[in-house]
């Protein structure tokens, strides 16, 4: 009953807000969407039945502005989810801007990969299948931009840590446990206290010239994913081995950059970052609590071009653990590629697209073909599939989750 009352109150407030601003100068936009997916294995169960209502309220007047972005996800057999993706105020001055509140912050040049794009944490409750403006979670932050010609200095202060959102344990996207079934979990160290010393800070310099667009960034943050500390024990009475898993978040520092330039019609993109303080799982019996701290580098090189009306984009991504030792569970070199093919038809009312992640270490992949058709002004029909190949690795572990889906969306 409390859930029903809470949902009703939120809906009333939401529609009251729409009524108050309708017809005034405040801009209103958003969309309504149905998303239905069916698994292509087993009994062809529904992978998802989701109805989405997304709203944007925006206004800029003189030296101030604001944006509020509430949303509702309704599911057939799950609790309805209400949220506020963004809610911020903008203050404009002669040489700098200030944005305060909940916001999504996007950095870097990569498509579908997060290297320097680390300010906004990720919502992986549906793995990597959500649209990227839904995967990036809003965070409460203060963002200041200072402009000098075509250059921008950006500073971000995040007072409260927000971790990656993982799938529920009953979700088809919940990763298979890597521990024994008898393992116990101790979450006593899994919380980062809300205090000043636990804040996150980021800085970025962006430059734009006639030849190149580039960014240089740095950050002192929390790793959005916890390290799995492990304590092995032996029951003195039965001599049975035991395992206690203790998720814990750690501080991490990083520095990196990205660039984009055009050479004879071909767009060349690059992005890289150096991470200090990452904890990796280790099989070394001498490793304290089964983890070891290492530095690592991740980089990307990408090409975009158009051939016979087809947009072609490719990326190669590599992650390298420095000062590697063989006891680390992860590979020293993790290699991945992405490919995007896209073409418009029927006066740009029909788009065919193929996007694929390819894991080169484990020969696994996520292949995502889709067709989008503009039925009428504001109405869009999308037909697609998510095909997982391989039997292990980041994508192969979901080999039984192949699905076909459609989305019907009205934007206003």
Task: Give the positions of each predicted feature.
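Repeated loop/turn-to-beta-strand initiation elements of outer-membrane beta-barrel proteins
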Residues: 26, 62-68, 96-98, 150-153, ...
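Outer-membrane beta-barrel "beta-signal"
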Residues: 379, 400-412
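Residues that define the transmembrane beta-barrel architecture of outer-membrane proteins
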Residues: 45-51, 81-85, 94, 136-140, ...
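Residues on the lipid-exposed face of transmembrane beta-strands in outer-membrane beta-barrel proteins
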Residues: 53-59, 86-91, 142-146, 203-207, ...
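Transmembrane beta-strand segments that form the barrel wall of outer-membrane beta-barrel proteins
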Residues: 31-40, 65-74, 82-85, 98, ...
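Detector for outer-membrane/organellar transmembrane beta-barrel domains
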Residues: 260-357
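Extracellular loop and loop/strand-boundary signature of outer-membrane beta-barrel proteins
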Residues: 40-43, 73-75, 85, 127-130, ...
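Outer membrane beta-barrel
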Residues: 60-173, 210, 390
């Amino acid at each position: 009953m409390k859930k029903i009352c809470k949902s009703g109150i939120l809906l009333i407030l939401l529609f009251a807000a729409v009524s108050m601003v309708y017809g005034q100068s405040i801009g209103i936009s958003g969309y309504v969407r149905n998303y239905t997916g069916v698994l292509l294995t087993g009994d062809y169960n529904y992978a998802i039945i989701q109805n989405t209502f997304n709203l944007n309220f925006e206004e800029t007047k003189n030296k101030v502005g604001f944006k509020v972005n509430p949303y509702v996800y309704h599911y057939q057999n799950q609790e309805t989810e209400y949220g506020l993706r963004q809610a911020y105020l903008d203050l404009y001055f002669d040489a700098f801007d200030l944005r305060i509140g909940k916001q999504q912050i996007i950095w870097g040049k990569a498509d579908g990969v997060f290297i320097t794009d680390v300010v906004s944490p990720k919502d992986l409750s549906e793995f990597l299948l959500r649209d990227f403006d839904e995967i990036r979670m809003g965070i409460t932050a203060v963002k200041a931009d200072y402009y000098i010609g075509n250059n921008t200095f950006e500073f971000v202060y995040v007072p409260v840590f927000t971790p990656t959102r993982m799938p529920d344990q009953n979700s088809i996207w919940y990763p298979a446990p890597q521990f024994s079934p008898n393992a116990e979990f101790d979450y006593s160290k899994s919380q980062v206290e809300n205090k000043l010393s636990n804040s996150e800070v980021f800085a970025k310099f962006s430059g734009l010239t006639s030849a190149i667009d580039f960014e240089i960034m740095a950050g002192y943050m929390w790793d959005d994913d916890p390290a799995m500390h492990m304590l092995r024990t032996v029951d003195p009475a039965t001599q049975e081995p035991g395992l206690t898993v203790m998720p814990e978040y750690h501080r991490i520092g990083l520095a990196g950059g990205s660039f984009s330039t055009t050479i004879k019609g071909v767009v060349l993109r690059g992005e890289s970052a150096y991470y200090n303080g990452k904890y990796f799982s280790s099989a070394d019996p001498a490793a304290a609590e089964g983890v070891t701290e290492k530095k690592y580098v991740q980089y990307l090189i990408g090409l975009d071009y158009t051939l016979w009306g087809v947009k072609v984009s490719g990326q190669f991504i590599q992650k390298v653990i420095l000062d590697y030792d063989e006891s680390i569970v992860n590979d020293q070199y993790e290699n991945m590629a992405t490919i995007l093919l896209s073409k418009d038809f029927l006066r740009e009312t029909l788009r065919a697209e193929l996007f694929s992640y390819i894991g080169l270490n484990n020969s696994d992949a996520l292949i995502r073909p889709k067709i989008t058709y503009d039925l009428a002004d504001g109405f869009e029909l999308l037909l697609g599939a998510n095909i997982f190949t391989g039997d292990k690795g980041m994508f192969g572990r979901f080999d039984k989750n192949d699905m076909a889906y459609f989305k019907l969306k009205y934007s206003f």
